[in-house]
Amino acid sequence: IPEVPIVTHEIGQYETYPNFKEIEKYTGSLKARNFEVFRERLDEKGLLPLAEDYFKCSGKLAVQCYKEEMEAVFRSRLLGGFQILDIQDFSGQGTALVGVLDAFMDSKGLITDSEWREFCNDAVVMARFDSYVLEAGSSFKAHTELCNYRPDLKDGKLICTLTLENGDVIGKVEKNFIAEGNYTDICDVEFTLPQVTKNTKAVLALEIEGTDIRNHYDLWVIP
């Protein structure tokens, strides 16, 4: 265990596909020539109609990767913190589309600010589990924990709910806890998944009652 704090440097840097609608924002001396070249190449391959899908899908994947990596840091007892390159795209050296904001600090529409704060904040509640893809009728197990840098948060109540996309609640667990420094193991939860006839989305939602501390995980239940 290190005796001095270790802070990770520029973690993440997950790329998103270019959003060609951004080209029209460059109204001054700086032009998005790189985006224009990318668009031209895509058009030559007959794939330009898929550009919007490429942008949205790659963006959602990048957001999920950032969430996974930041939560890994928050769960670690051996790291003192982390630094990401930026939450906006970096256009200073070539093309680095690594942000959830574009080069103009505008949202790309991939995630809201409140959703980002679920896993990037001074207090983050999290769940550990083996897989995001679950078999119908099986048992889903998760461990819940809190990374807390709020001096006024001494205790609280965790509310953990697993819900299907149609609103049906599979199960709910409430657990009081005492905050133990910066890291608190709250409890283990277990839910029996229902039988389904098609791939079905489920959401594992966590919140600390009476606070803005919350998080959620999108899961898939398969027949």
Q: What is each of the regions a protein language model found here?
A:
Residues 1-164, 170, 181:
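Substrate-binding clefts and catalytic carboxylate motifs of secreted carbohydrate-active enzymes
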Residues 146, 162, 191-193, 208:
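Hydrophobic beta-strand positions in extracellular immunoglobulin-like domains
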Residues 168-197:
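Intrinsically disordered, low-complexity Pro/Gly/Ser/Thr-rich segments with frequent PxxP/GP/PP motifs
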Residues 178, 211-223:
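Short beta-strand elements
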Residues 199-210:
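Short, aromatic- and glycine-rich surface loops/edge beta-strands on solvent-exposed regions
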